[in-house]
């Protein structure tokens, strides 16, 4: 998936307070949680998008980080908090 498309989707999720589920080619799933209502997943503090290296870095409030190659992303699903 193109990094600029990913950037637009994740920025919308941040602004709107959504949960975004990122599905990778190998079947793994990662979550970006900007919702204040969904407590099932750790809240996301920030996202860093490195367009040059096609790298998405998800930084959670508990200090954990996910590093994802944007070329391995096949689907992003977002939904409002319940």
Residue ranges, per PLM feature:
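Short, surface-exposed linear segments at secondary-structure transitions and domain or protein termini
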Residues: 1, 38-49, 75-82
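Acidic, low-complexity, intrinsically disordered interaction modules
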Residues: 26-65
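Short, compact, well-ordered microdomains
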Residues: 60-82
